[in-house]
Amino acid sequence: MAYFNDIAPIKYEGTKTKNMFAFRHYNPEEVVAGKTMEEQLHFALAFWHTITMDGSDPFGGATMERPWDLEGGSELDRAHRRVDAFFEIAEKLGVKYYCFHDIDIAPTGNSLKEFYANLDEITDHLLEKQKATGIKLLWNTANMFSNPRYMNGVSTSNRAEVFAYGAAQVKKGLELSKKLGGENYVFWGGREGYESLLNTDRGLEMDHMAKFFHLAIDYAKSINHLPIFLIEPKPKEPMTHQYDFDAATALAFLQKYDLDKYFKLNLETNHAWLVGHTFEHELNTARTFNALGSIDANQGNYLLGWDTDEFPTLVIDITLAMHQILLNGGLGKGGINFDAKVRRTSFKAEDLILAHIAGMDTYARALKGAAAIIEDKFLSDIVDERYTSYKNTEVGQSIENGTATFESLAAFALEHGDDIELDSNHLEYIKSVLNDYLV
């Protein structure tokens, strides 16, 4: 059954259009920085926020009008309808990738065995849809935070039985990734951390988390399907202190446990804000360590201190993010997954399409602005000029080429230390000109 017959496929109509159901900036065929927008922006739809989110919150019940959930039948019947609705939305938008948690797509049933069977049935349906539409699986993951058994985490749980149950979920998830041709597999450790250090052996828990990841790698190799593994950092919520706190913390963990050759990072805007970082900072950190894998596209609310997962509309923030992504040479096999939910007051089914249009237009604007910054060498020239003392002075060259010693540097300071001339950063000017690049 079709749920959006009254909405035509979304097309690019430019900024003069008055059509709500049209792209004003995202033109998939437009060439930017040597590639089409569609090639530069591997957009993906998130099954959970798009299809299963009902608008309920701690203060009120469901608000969303979701016709695919109102037709009766079994939970499996509803799951099949959700797949149909999801792919219809993706086709309307021209989005080529999607992502899901295991419990998003299939009912968990009354046992793990029943859950496996439900997943098999629904992924048969997903595979049919993929073949019919050409839409691909960007990544999947296991929800290991909602069920009460995971209240203390999975690999970091104090109960070995919970560790085993989580392994069973990931084992199945990797099998489904192979079945559906997934290019990445995500771990988000929402409850992998500690509530209080008073009763926590942090070192032991992190050792166990590393063992869990190595077991996942071993199993992926055994089934001849080794996707790019992605860790998604977040500092808190739901756990008080999560072990994958931010990009730098996650990278330190991966390096310590010899996981860095298998893992990259899946970075989210709102998670960066929760740490107190900009999204640009997190992307730059990952890029510096050659670990930028994929991103979750959303934004928070500057006035709120939690993960609001709003659709991205802040052009300057996303332009700076796209600048880092372009400097990285793109996202490779990663993509731009809209881990974003419509506000509970945007309750019409059509709002799902309108919200994704807004997000896709924002990233298209950001792409054009970031490409212009790079083409004009606006920021790169400023950065190069700022560090010229390491190229144009004898002492700077000695530091760069490794011939400097503390003795030679001290001798230089004794002779010239009172003559140092500092440079102004002119940061206000830079920020002012940056605004000229916002599309």
UniProtKB/Swiss-Prot annotation:
It comes from the Bacteria. Changing V275A: In strain: NRRL B-4449 and IO-1. One of its GO terms (molecular function) is xylose isomerase activity. Changing D218Y: In strain: 210. Its cofactor is Mg(2+). It holds the Pfam family AP_endonuc_2. Homotetramer. This is Xylose isomerase. It comes from Lactococcus lactis subsp. lactis (strain IL1403).
